[in-house]
Amino acid sequence: MSLHSAGHCTFCLLLFTFYLSCPAQDGDYELAPPPLKFVAKDDKERLESQADLKSRTKLALELMDQRLAEGERLNSSGNFDGLFRELGRFRGLVDYTFGFLGKNDPNNKKVLDNYKRLEISLRSFMSRVEVIHRELPFKYEEYVRGLVKYLRVARTKALDPQFSDTVLPGDKPSD
């Protein structure tokens, strides 16, 4: 009988040991909230002042480049909250540019050229955002990973008007 009691004690001790190790798992990590996605008032005024489609798209791409350059500088100095603010402004500019191009006729060659210009720039921006993503602490990583995915979708969205149902441009052939 004492052997049986010793087995119970050993079992209880073993069960107690495993019970204590279960709560030692990592808790939830605190993630940074996503930044506000907006276009600054002065950026919007500069964009609205451009009447030409090509010059407006080029200006929007320059502003996006400035936001990313400032974000890269803030990232290297360890100011991650400032980086997030710049990434939010960057994404706001991307959305604003797509909204502007979407209001124009997608069959117009000038509009298609600007979509192509936007897609080429988004490709280079995406690689820069991926470099920022590699250097970030875990707290900020989720939003930047989502931004990379968003840029992939945006590139596809910029390419879609280039490929329509017809292969050859021009009028439909007569019967």
Model-identified regions with their sequence ranges:
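Bacterial N-terminal signal peptides that target proteins for export
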Residues: 1-10
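N-terminal start-of-domain structural block
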Residues: 2, 22-23
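Bacterial N-terminal signal peptides
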Residues: 9-21
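Long, charged/polar, soluble alpha-helical segments
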Residues: 24-175
